[in-house]
Amino acid sequence: MFFLTKILPLRGRIFPMFGCLLLIVSLITGCIASPAAEVAETVFDSKPVDFMTFKDSTNTLFLNAEFGDVYLSQDNGQSWRNGVISGQVCPIKKLIKHSFENSRVFALTECDTVYYSYDNGENWDYFTIDHPISITQLPFHFHAKNPDYVIFNNQYCSSSGTWVGKICKPDLYYTKDGFQSDPEPMPVGSSYCIFADSSEKMVVSSEEQIICISLNPNSAARPPFSHHIVYSDDWFQSIVPVQLHNFLGSDGAYGILSTGSFLVAALIDAATRKLFVYVSQDGYYWEEALKFHKGFEFDAFTILPSTEYSFFIDSLDSHPNNPTGILYSLDSESNTFVIRQMNTNRYVDGYTDFMLIDYLDGLQFVNVVENVDEIEVDPQVDKVLSSRITFDGGKTWSTVASPESSCNSMKQCSLHLFLDPHVSHASIASSKFAPGILLASGSVGDRLLSENQMDLFVSEDGGRNWTLSRDGMHLFAMSGFGSIFFASEYLDVINEVYYSLDHGQSWVTVTLDKTIVPIKLFASEDPYAEIFYLLAMTDDGEQSNYSLFSFNFGKFLPKECQFSNSESNKNDFEKWYTRYANGSPICSEMGKKEFFWRKKATSVCSVPKSITDLHGSFDACECTDEDYECNTQFISNDQGECKLLDFIGSLLCASEDLDTFQKIPYRLVPGNKCTPNKRDSHREPQTFNCDSFNEPGTEITSFLYDFDEKIVDVVYLEGTVPEENTFLIGISVNSHVYFSEDEGKTWDKFSKEEFSSVLPHAYNKNSVYMVTSKNIVYFTTNRGKNFYKFKAPSPPNQNGKSLFSFHPSRPAWLLYAGSENCEKNPFADDCRDVVFVSLDFGDTWSRLPSNLEYCSWAKAEKLVVDDTLIFCIRQNTNDPFKKELISSIDFFEYEQDEILNDVVGFMIEDEYVIVAVQDEEGTSLSLDVSINGLNFASCSFPAYLNVHPKQAYTILDSQTHSLFIHVTTNTHLGSEWGDILKSNSNGTYFMTSLANVNRDSVGYVDFERLEGIQGIALANIVSNTKELTDGGTKKLQTLITFNDGLDWSYLNLVGGEKIVPKCGKNCYLHLHGYTERNQFSDPTSTNAAVGLIIGVGSFSPFLIPYEESQTFISRDAGVTWYRIFDSPHLWAFLDSGSIIIAVESISPTNVIKYSADEGRTWQEYQFSEKSKVVVDVSTKPSGVGHQVLLLTTDDENAPISSVLIDFDALYRRTCVFDEENSEESDFVRWVPTDISGKPLCLRGRISSFYRKSIHKKCRVGSSLLVKEEVLSKCECTRADFECDYNYRRLKDGTCVLVSGLQPPDTREEQCSVDDAFEWRQPTGYKRTPLTECEGGVPLDAGTLHPCPGKEDDYYKAHPKPGGWSIFLTIIFSILLAAVAGCILYYYSRRFLKGAIRLGSDSATENPLESGISYTRGAFSSIPIFFSALYQSVRSLFIRSTPTNGEFENAAFLQNYEIDDDDEESV
């Protein structure tokens, strides 16, 4: 029987259809008929998305994404209407329901408006924010207890219309009243925030606590290293930094989130890229979670659903394109990760086949990959998946029991479940109101079959046993209490759907009046509503549409269910225990006998809302062996006994210098509720003797390996985890590759193939790409654990360009610079460069346009541009000898932009994009620079420089927010030198930092920064340039700078006059520089050994030959130097500088020297019987290792032998850092000072660093991460300022306006800042980006003006002076000016040439020059003072209005002659 009701047409977007009331005749004998279903169908011309239902409501909601409208049904889907948001202006893009308040829903637009409803979608309001909304991420973060507390983590993404593409910035807000008032913006610098109380399982101290990742105002690093974690529990009235790590604090904040009862924070150390994970359960107390674990790879783990006592992580463990993982859990007691399952099935986006049934303690499902070995050989192989189940939280796993009748004669037979998190029907349907009842798709056999071979299975005992419910792949759902199962066939055209009233044992067919293709099936979120919704595609012959069916069984269930706490026939509920044996309840794997009430399968009734809690109770069981597992730091052996990990025993013995210690080998499985009995010995501590853990002694060990050919380079894959072995790659002169997995003790040949290139990944320390002569590329992403290969898309280029351009944030993205038609003849007419792009680690390649010569990712670690932006060099179509710089953000599919013409080349250095451009005549070479991606500006060089295209630029670095370049000024072969230029912070104006700096014929420059302390660098100059015009030998001298290239001085050797008594005053210490060093030698300094520098050189007027040189050390960052050896040595820093090794580099030797007191005393270790020449010394690049690798040979062409010397056993105890108790700490605070002992001002501050005390006998290991601590701020000096835009700096430090340019107008920029009411007139100077100085010389303190419309606020802050004050000020100023004028006139006649000059800070000035500079510096501020005075007097009589960039002090500046003809080098 059908009862037809008409569905109202809705504005032409829904086709008029009919609903029907379908009465289904019972197929079951008995006095009670099977219930009917009320069925309604509505047809739409576009696909409904974001479908949602509500608890305790008949309302249903969805989004028509094509038109941006929200549709509402108030009768469980029988009828629909749109336009429910009155006054809607912007199309809706996304619907989001409140996580904890079911009646609240939010509608996101891409405008600046968010609509919201607090009554299940019936009535709507809105709030606006300052910028358009980005829906690439879900912006809302909800409070678990107070629904009115909401955080809105928006990202404002804008496109400048230029080649940079889209750039996103944080745009965060919060509300305390559910957006009844305008949302409050988060503090400036906030990038992501959450509530501490963000889970129903959380227990926090303050409900108002907010935790944020925020920009650290004291950090000059790049993101994420510039960000730290802060919290506030008073709505940002106060903000407290979170101290997670002794040295890092919380710098390097990579992410924060909540899961289960845990807050999780991840930090990345900028120096080592090591990942630190911290957990908290109250938002205040945090504990490191990886303390005894080897660690996870950066950006390769996934946080999974968690419980109140454990949370789960899946970590990548294979090829990223066909990934597998390792499942870990962490519990609230130990805060230590434990491996729970290997070879889990992961997806490229990080999702994992994992399912947790949260209301049943310990019940989880996971799919594992059975053919991992095949995938490691060939990542293209399809995965073979099988399912596992655990009932004890991951301690033990088993296959899923298959239905008894399904296996037939198969040897390996179990049930495998479809758990793909990307597919809505690939899940397990369950409900806490129907405990133990599970509904899932899968297949029976030895593996999970394809979707079209899957069936529908049911379990009624929490996954222990399963039955086949329906054949074929289905969409499925069950009502909240399990009263009704509903299913439709999938992957086919159908006209029938099915429902079951007895937990899937039998099914009733409902025939529809049309054929459909089901898409999704939903059950009502209201557990008391027996309603299902089916979304399907239909076809009326003209076009495909979407039908939304609702099936309402609730009205026709014959009775209301009866519930009582006693089991009887009248009770519609039964008592179900979580585990049975022989029909009787027994203790579960979680140490308790637990039961729930659930509706009987035979009861056909509707559950009243008075029934809310079906959890009965549990009784704790007596503990057995099965309730325990190995404690953290222990591992189970073959006999099932828990044995302490060897490295843990060694670590504990070393850290405390113990003879014995106690540990408890066992612990209860997290969440287990059993009660230990008196005889239970599992919790008793076990005593361990340190002698049994390979106790470190004092023996240094060495390992010799003889190669059969010459090794010319060694590549270290140190990775992100210092505790693990470093993977080494050796490259031979014959193009063979060797590898070592044990730090260099033993080596194996990678293959018989010859390799043309070995390219470490520029941004990923775990990765290297190796290219064979046959264009096969081998690569690893996990530090050599697995190597994969692909075929290069073409032969390599023939002109020396780097083969690969690596992306800084997307490791799978590669650009390849190849060639075609060049192998036989690289000069052939059809030989050309080609460029390819891959987004999947080289599995597939796309060729870019054919006229491109070279391309590079534009995004750098400090350059904020679109991820897809690439720069390319393209041949000019009209002139093949001219080239253009172009860009694209879609790999030239639709868009490209031409940036510059006549380009020679380009490079990206941190935040700078640098392009070399030649003029139209081809006679001069210049640079164009961009730092913001919006425009390029031509660099202004000193007037004396005119660089020919055949001359060389060498980009040195940009670590200090200034670009350092070397411009070659003499190109005579063998006598090359040039000038080092330093730019202002935007890279457009350069001053000469140091002239006549040495370089070699290849282009390398004798310029090297001190690692670990910014602003200090060494350089070698050619002192006899006039003698070399016709050839000759360079005479080199070494200089050092402590203020980032503004001043340079000679090196000070302590006792130098005793070393070379007859040398005289012309002798200084000079060092052999970068151009003379082996390409793979260790650097002069390292970040890990801050302040320590070693070099080979001589105390002489000029640098003498290397073989005649001696070896020197500085322990104070280059201020003073000491001789340590009479001959040249190679060296390396081990254990963060606590051990220094050195070995003779010219003469054959079999002895290595080592020092544990920063080179004050040395001991020797004989590493072989035979003496050989040591050609290279190498160690971990981070400087934290304890091993050093020597490459030795008998003569220049003989095969190489490697000697690994292991100093790991030198000290047994691990150093302890105790910031509070300096006497107990093994580290001392070191403050850099100048030669007089005065603390050095570096970047405007006096800083301290921690180094191991030379008097403490311990090993640093990874216990020390060098961190600078600011002790005090310095007064500002001229070194803290640079020239403002459109100004250039003369050699004396004076900033003058560039001829033809105007001073920058920054009024709008300054006044646009929140709460700004005044703007400051530029003076030509601005603070350098890195300085933190305070007070002192205010060179950037220009005249203040009120912002437009803020005059009242301005004059409140700056009251006008009274009449007498003005009169006295004028009289005093006139007298002072008269005296000053006389003094200035006197000195200017004697010493000055008329320029305004800044006082010099150099300690090398003579007294007369110093006095003159001071006088000039003091009185050069008088014109600015008069300008301010004039402005204050004038404002009494003239209405003050904002100026338009006119500078009144310019008139006073013009009273002085600007010395603008002096652009020489310093």
Swiss-Prot record:
Membrane topology listed for this record: Single-pass type I membrane protein
Taxonomy, superkingdom: Eukaryota
GO-annotated cellular components: cytosol; Golgi apparatus; late endosome; membrane; trans-Golgi network
Tagged with keyword S-adenosyl-L-methionine: no
Effect of residue 1425 to A: No cpy1 secretion
Identification of the protein by name: Vacuolar protein sorting/targeting protein 10
Entries under InterPro entries matching the protein: Sortilin_C, Sortilin_N, VPS10, VPS10-sortilin, WD40/YVTN_repeat-like_dom_sf
CDD domains, per the entry: Sialidase_non-viral
Ranges in the topological domain labelled Lumenal: 34-1363
Compartments where located: Golgi apparatus, trans-Golgi network membrane; Prevacuolar compartment membrane
Matches recorded under SUPFAM superfamilies: Oligoxyloglucan reducing end-specific cellobiohydrolase
GO terms for biological process, alphabetical: Golgi to endosome transport; Golgi to vacuole transport; protein targeting to vacuole
Molecular-function GO terms, alphabetical: nucleotide binding; vacuolar sorting signal binding
Family: Belongs to the VPS10-related sortilin family.
Pfam families associated with the record: Sortilin-Vps10, Sortilin_C
Transmembrane segments: 1364-1384
Annotated function: Functions as a sorting receptor in the Golgi compartment required for the intracellular sorting and delivery of soluble vacuolar proteins, like carboxypeptidase Y (CPY) and proteinase A. Executes multiple rounds of sorting by cycling between the late Golgi and a prevacuolar endosome-like compartment.
BNR repeats: 71-82, 115-126, 388-399, 457-468, 498-509, 738-749, 778-789, 836-847, 1039-1050, 1112-1123, 1153-1164
Side Cytoplasmic, residues: 1385-1466
UniProt keyword terms in alphabetical order: Glycoprotein, Golgi apparatus, Membrane, Nucleotide-binding, Protein transport, Receptor, Repeat, Signal, Transmembrane, Transmembrane helix, Transport
Segment forming the signal sequence: 1-33
Source organism of this protein record: Schizosaccharomyces pombe (strain 972 / ATCC 24843) (Fission yeast)
